[in-house]
A protein has these predicted regions:
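Short, aliphatic-rich beta-strand segments
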Residues: 196-206, 258-262
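A short, glycine/Asx- and small/polar-enriched loop/turn
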Residues: 121-125, 195-198, 417-418
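Terminal RNA-binding accessory module
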Residues: 1-75
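Short, acidic/hydrophobic/Gly-rich beta-strand patch recurrent on exposed beta strands
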Residues: 20-25, 142-146, 325
Length: 429
């Protein structure tokens, strides 16, 4: 079997990570994008390893009753491969995947609740577009990278984004077309929108001598800027700012607290459901106990769940996040202590009398953090995770002295395989 070969596969189930799992004729496992359990499909092989293969569905021979038409026919595999499934099926699947991850560590998780937005579309407040040159029309298009490739798929919009993001992005595209800007000079377009529907857009270019000066009002935004970004780096990093018009930062309210943030900074992409999570976290904190917020980012958890007289300490490794947390703390909780450090290098700040909040990256907790928690035994740990697999791994270690008192799953990113999970741990007396 060779790469790009098309084979017929019966799919069995959806696995953690988002693909459907099936078997090839020789018994080798194959993980497939664009398929659902119980479907018979034709699959184009994209990877062929010794013990497993990957592929993308090219034709559905026998469809699942849960299959629906994707809203973004041409680009859903790039951004949101679960557009093909019924929304109730998606939410039930995410619930079961959380439980399965804990079961792999011999933890029988009782998921107390699972929260998902009513509308699975138009929720993202931040989108990054690439660019593509159309040889037929001889003009640029917005684009996303095709999943698992370096090739691009032209798009007009994405159904995941807030409507004003699509509107501003296509307007900028049209202005760039009028100026005859070439795709080879452009890197990405980053567009962000707050809950007041104000938009700021940042255009990243590969050449310093590109002359693009567009008023923010011309594209319907409150701010627009152009930045040279080193073309040797795949990421959209600001090497030099070439042009700015209007605002450079946005404001948003989270549980009544005003946060200021940069377009390219870290801020929640789905604020309404994040607020619901924070309300639940606050219900599980003791206002009389100090809070330590590890992996705190811009501080939105700690700053939103503490009471006026409650002691708060934030630990964060990213200097830009710390700067934004400091700026926001001045307005919300001036006495908060904010420390620039990795959590594993700040374990001495973990003490017995605190409520400890954990919101680590996908890799989960550092072993030093786990060891310190087991040593000093804070009475309560609140663990929010964007990766239930590593969360379950960490909690299996913490179960030496902790028990799960509450668990709540969240669908922050509908139509994608991403899952958030909140677990409350209490020390066993």
């Amino acid at each position: 079997m060779k790469k790009q070969e098309v084979v017929e596969v019966k799919l069995n189930k959806t696995i953690y990570g988002g693909q459907a799992l099936g078997k090839l004729e020789d018994g080798k496992k194959i993980m497939v994008w664009g398929g659902l359990p119980e479907e018979l499909v034709k699959v184009k092989i994209t990877k062929n390893k010794r013990n497993w293969a990957e592929g993308i569905v090219t034709e559905v021979i026998e469809a699942s009753k849960e299959r629906i038409e994707p809203k973004d026919q041409d680009s859903y595999l790039s951004t949101s491969p679960w557009q093909i499934m019924n929304y109730d099926f998606e939410n039930n699947l995410k619930r079961s995947l959380i439980i399965d991850q804990f079961a792999q560590h011999a933890i029988e998780l009782n998921l107390n609740d699972f929260t998902a937005p009513e509308d699975p579309y138009h929720y993202r407040n931040k989108v990054e577009f690439s660019f593509w040159w159309n040889n037929e029309t001889e003009q640029i298009d917005l684009a996303f990278f095709k999943r698992g490739t370096h090739t691009k798929q032209p798009v007009n919009e994405t159904s995941l984004a807030l409507q004003n993001i699509n509107k501003v992005a296509t307007t900028i595209r049209d202005v760039l077309r009028q100026k005859n800007i070439q795709a080879r000079d452009l890197k990405t377009l980053l567009v962000r929108c707050n809950q007041s529907e104000e938009v700021i857009a940042e255009l990243y270019v590969k050449e310093q001598d590109v002359d693009i000066q567009i008023s923010h009002t011309e594209v319907g935004a409150v701010g627009f800027s152009v930045h040279y970004s080193n073309p040797k780096s795949p990421a959209s990093i600001k090497t030099k700012t070439l042009f700015t018009s209007g605002a450079t930062k946005l404001e948003d309210k989270i549980l009544g607290n005003v946060f200021t943030y940069s377009v390219d900074g870290f801020f929640q992409v789905t604020v309404p459901i994040y607020e619901q999570t924070l309300k639940t976290i606050k219900e599980h904190t003791d206002p009389k106990k100090p809070i330590l917020d590890l992996y705190s980012g811009v501080g939105s958890i700690g700053l939103c769940v503490t009471s006026p007289n409650q002691n708060l300490k934030l630990i964060e490794i990213d200097e830009r996040c710390v700067n934004e947390a400091t700026l926001n703390a001045k307005k919300i909780k001036p006495e908060a202590e904010i420390i620039l450090s990795s959590s594993e290098d700040a374990v001495d700040h973990i003490t017995n009398e605190q409520t400890v909040i954990l919101d680590p990256p996908r890799a989960g907790l550092h072993q030093k953090v786990i060891d310190r928690l087991l040593k000093v035994k804070p009475a309560k740990i609140i663990y929010l995770s964007c990766n239930p697999a590593t969360q379950a791994r960490d909690i299996a270690l913490l179960e030496q002295i902790y028990k799960i008192s509450y668990a709540h799953g969240y669908n922050y990113f509908p139509r994608t395989p991403h899952i958030e999970n909140l677990v409350i741990l209490e020390v066993v007396s």
